[in-house]
Every structure is written in structure tokens, then in C-alpha cells.
Amino acid sequence: MSETSPHRSGSVAVIGRPNVGKSTLTNALVGAKVSIVSNRPQTTRHRLLGIATFPEGQLMLVDTPGLHREQKRAMNRVMNRAARGSLEGVDAAVLVIEAGRWDEEDTLAFRVLSDADVPVVLVVNKVDRLKDKTALFPFLAQVSEGRTFAAVHPVSALKRKGLEALVSDLLKLVPEAEAMYGEDEITDRSQRFLAGELVREQLMRQLGEELPYATTVEIERFAEDGALLRIGAVIWVEREGQKAIVIGKGGTRLKDIGGKARLQMERLFGAKVFLETWVRVREGWSDDEAALKAFGYD
């Protein structure tokens, strides 16, 4: 954009199936970690606003849970509702897919966007992982056939490649307006919420396939004590056997999870953190709408 271009500001929903890199893309555009990431599908469970500020304008990026077909448990239904609800009132949307792959859940995400009547930018992520680079353009042609996109951008969110052109096109789709947030603001979520997410991220990263799906984190205490933040985090599971998995032999796994989460908090919050963690059991919470609401699910 030229220096005489008007300032633009608007909201953009980031939509796609699980594990395509929506949160990595959001973090890359914001320039800071506002959404947790892991290799585990459905890492993102809540809508989260990431604020990306540029000289030409500001993009309010609504990171969302991955749209998926599974509807059996209440938590699956809640996450799908959160993803669909993120499209209300946005100026544009980004459909994130993985380079070289389009499946039924990508089709589901596209249909949801088609019903929303907003301009859609297709972001083809993870192009750095394509072994045969010549396969990219035939894949783009195949995906674009019979589907309308405002723009198509191959990117690597992890390596921050192709993002400048993407930002330029997204800013063209939002209205002329002043920024709604200050330059130093990166999310509308509280530090308390982010603390819980950072603990959950370490659970996913360290337990991998061992991690029970029905695991969530509740921050019971978040208090400033001079220059120190005192945080108490409860990890909820559904069975005693799952509790033992999270704690690990002699408590070593829980200690490691807490230690790594604390370092992430100190980096994000810019303050020393004293973190305590506990593991508790609440049977059937992931299929209980009231329990989900109590734990902060939309």
C-alpha cells in the first residue's frame, strides 16, 4: 500500500479443519503467541481474538476451533458452535488448508463459509512440507475449481513465508476505519485465560497420544504479589487412571509440565511466576453442557 492509502481496520475469521495451522498463522500475523499450538488435532477449543497491527491498518483475527464432523460429545458440539459463531459480524474470512490435501472436513469448512456471505481468502499452509514443489500449482487449480475465493495465498505460517502479500489482501477486504486497539495490544483474552491455555499446551506437547481427550485446565487462583504472579492451575480429567497418566511416576511429569508452562508464562507476561498445579477428577465433564460452561467453553 502507498503512504496515502487510508487506514483500514476490521475483523477476519480464521476457519479450517483441525490441525491445518490456524493458530500458527494467527500467531505469525500477530507477531506474538496468543494461541497455543501442538501437533494434536483440536488443540484450539475456544474462540480467541488476535490483534495484528500494521502501519496500513489493523486486523482482528478470530482464531477458532477446527471444524470437524464428530458430534457425539458435548465438547465437540460446543467447539463446532464456536467456530461457526465466529463468522457473525466479521468483514472477511480465511480458509486455511494444508498444501496437497483436501478432505471432507475441508469441504465442510468451505460450505460453512459459503453460507456466511463474506469474502473468503484461501490460505494454503505448510507449503514448506511439500516434497514435490511442482505439485503446488496443480493442487491450487484443483481446489479453486468450482469455488470462489477473493484471493489465494500459499504460505508457511511456521516459517513466516508469504505473509506480507496475505496481509495486503486482507487489509483490502476490511473497511476504512481507525484502529480499535492500541499498538501494544495483542489479544482480548485475559492473562488468566492465557495461563490456562499455556498449561494445556504443555499437556498436549508432553503427553502426546497418551493425553486423554477429556482434559481441561481451570485457573483457580491468579494474583499479583508485588512483582510476582501467583497462579494456581487445576488439570481436570474424567478418570483416576487418567489422573495417574498426567501426574507421572513420582509426580515427575506434572512437575515438568508445570515448569515448562511457567517459563512460557514468564515470557508472555513479562513477570516472574509462581505456579502450582493439581490434577482432579470430574467424571463425564466433557459430555456435560453445564460443566463445559463452568469451565469457560463458549
Curated annotation (Swiss-Prot):
Source domain of life: Bacteria
PANTHER family membership: GTPASE ERA, GTPASE ERA, MITOCHONDRIAL
CDD domains registered for this protein in UniProt: Era, KH-II_Era
G4 as annotated region, ranges: 125-128
Recorded GO CC terms: cytosol; plasma membrane
Residues holding GTP: 16-23, 63-67, 125-128
Renumbered residue ranges of the record's region G1: 16-23
SUPFAM superfamilies registered for this protein in UniProt: P-loop containing nucleoside triphosphate hydrolases, Prokaryotic type KH domain (KH-domain type II)
Gene Ontology MF terms: GTP binding; GTPase activity; ribosomal small subunit binding; rRNA binding; small ribosomal subunit rRNA binding
Family listed: Belongs to the TRAFAC class TrmE-Era-EngA-EngB-Septin-like GTPase superfamily. Era GTPase family.
Role, per record: An essential GTPase that binds both GDP and GTP, with rapid nucleotide exchange. Plays a role in 16S rRNA processing and 30S ribosomal subunit biogenesis and possibly also in cell cycle regulation and energy metabolism.
Ranges where the record places region G2: 42-46
Keyword Cell membrane found: yes
GO biological process: ribosomal small subunit assembly
The name this protein goes by in its record: GTPase Era
Main localization (coarse): cytoplasm
Pfam families attached to this UniProt entry: KH_2 (PF07650), MMR_HSR1 (PF01926)
Residue ranges of the region described as G3: 63-66
Domain (Era-type G): residue spans on this chain: 8-176
Entry's localization field: Cytoplasm; Cell inner membrane
Bilayer topology term: Peripheral membrane protein
Residue ranges constituting the KH type-2 domain according to the UniProt record: 199-283
